[in-house]
Amino acid sequence: MIARRIWRSHRFLRPFSSSSVCSPPFRVPEYLSQSSSSPASRPFFVHPPTLMKWGGGSRSWFSNEAMATDSNSGLIDVPLAQTGEGIAECELLKWFVKEGDSVEEFQPLCEVQSDKATIEITSRFKGKVALISHSPGDIIKVGETLVRLAVEDSQDSLLTTDSSEIVTLGGSKQGTENLLGALSTPAVRNLAKDLGIDINVITGTGKDGRVLKEDVLRFSDQKGFVTDSVSSEHAVIGGDSVSTKASSNFEDKTVPLRGFSRAMVKTMTMATSVPHFHFVEEINCDSLVELKQFFKENNTDSTIKHTFLPTLIKSLSMALTKYPFVNSCFNAESLEIILKGSHNIGVAMATEHGLVVPNIKNVQSLSLLEITKELSRLQHLAANNKLNPEDVTGGTITLSNIGAIGGKFGSPLLNLPEVAIIALGRIEKVPKFSKEGTVYPASIMMVNIAADHRVLDGATVARFCCQWKEYVEKPELLMLQMR
């Protein structure tokens, strides 16, 4: 009866139907084989797992297929499904459940981080957690089992099974405390690991008890103070303990790259294979400064913070309308240039989790106020490591606002498959000469455009930059052509 119910759920989700379970559509891979060798107890394999999104704006995902099931016992393996195009593995951040917990359909099971975003994985089945296969911090490949669920009436007997039997079925059994993990970012967890600290014993001072970098360093200092005291005592008795302790503080450390940092390695490595050229220009931002001040003085919404960036983004979109090849991508296999219909302008953001480039969709159809609100939303999500996969995919051109941190000149690398990226320097007052020879102060910003020389030539980029510069220096021209 249990097997029939499980099979009905598979038939409902699969694109084919069958009247029996005796003929699986795919060969069972070796890594799915269980301890039992009898045909009756051998699990069958269904279609490769994919993700389905539950709810229009939700960031929760679930696997629409169990990778392997045991029809005799009611065990279902829930795999890590495909979290996005080109994603082969994810880092497990934390568990929302522990072994023995009851779970409902669409209940969050865990949170994982791919190269592009942080995603909650939810349960497709109702049952109890029989086995958790990984701990926070583990790198899990797509298709590997995340958790084993006991479904229907067999769950009570499964959860009372001897622990050694469960280990044989699904791998090593972890302690509940280690599996749940502390609420923190990958960078903070790696820092704690490098310092030899169990992050679960640290009291977090961040939002919702999140363990921050400062918490780890503070805990490390306290631990180091105690260690130093002990070392000093040994130094009096033993002689050379102090020098041994001092030398150990300067040992090499290996820091694994995770999440966005790992994605940056892949993207920048690919970028080195593309022929770049750079075009540098100065833009007078006096009018931009006045416009920002006007918006600030007439702002009636306290939740909106006006900056230079929305106007730069909108003026960039207006220039792209006249030079569509700058808003394109290149297909090296077919030697074709794909002109993008939408202006999805990405903005590079440096966060404590790494560099991420979310993009504002359809800028050509948005007002300055709408761009300001969307930019604020993306910045908030990026700071909290909550960007959706849709927010970081589909970009057509990128702005890197290095001037917000410091520096007036940058030399960016392409964010493939885009063909252009623009580094914005700091706006600063410098002396300039007028046509009459008098000196006057001007707010100048240096911009550096990196372009794919397979698609764009110097003349095209120069004309494009001059058009963008004109819109920035004379924002009233935007009013003539805005739709």
UniProtKB/Swiss-Prot annotation:
One GO-annotated biological process of the protein: cellular response to sucrose starvation
Expression by tissue: Expressed in the non-photosynthetic organs such as siliques, flowers and roots.
CDD domains, A to Z: lipoyl_domain
Modified residues (N6-lipoyllysine): K116
Transit peptide: 1-75
Up-regulation conditions: By dark treatment (at the protein level). Induced by the calmodulin antagonists trifluoperazine and fluphenazine in darkness. Down-regulated by sucrose in a hexokinase dependent manner (at protein level). Up-regulated by Leucine and its derivative alpha-keto acid (KIC).
Enzyme class: transferase
Main location per the UniProt record: mitochondrion
Keyword NADP: no
Keywords: Acyltransferase, Fatty acid biosynthesis, Fatty acid metabolism, Lipid biosynthesis, Lipid metabolism, Lipoyl, Mitochondrion, Transferase, Transit peptide
Cofactor: binding details: Binds 1 lipoyl cofactor covalently.
Subcellular location: Mitochondrion matrix
One GO cellular component term: mitochondrion
Active-site residues from the entry: H453, D457
The organism's place on the tree of life at top rank: Eukaryota
Domain Peripheral subunit-binding (PSBD) residues, every copy: 183-220
Domain Lipoyl-binding span(s) in chain numbering: 76-150
UniProt function note: The branched-chain alpha-keto dehydrogenase complex catalyzes the overall conversion of alpha-keto acids to acyl-CoA and CO(2). It contains multiple copies of three enzymatic components: branched-chain alpha-keto acid decarboxylase (E1), lipoamide acyltransferase (E2) and lipoamide dehydrogenase (E3). Within this complex, the catalytic function of this enzyme is to accept, and to transfer to coenzyme A, acyl groups that are generated by the branched-chain alpha-keto acid decarboxylase component.
Subunit structure: Forms a 24-polypeptide structural core with octahedral symmetry.
Protein name: Lipoamide acyltransferase component of branched-chain alpha-keto acid dehydrogenase complex, mitochondrial
Organism: Arabidopsis thaliana
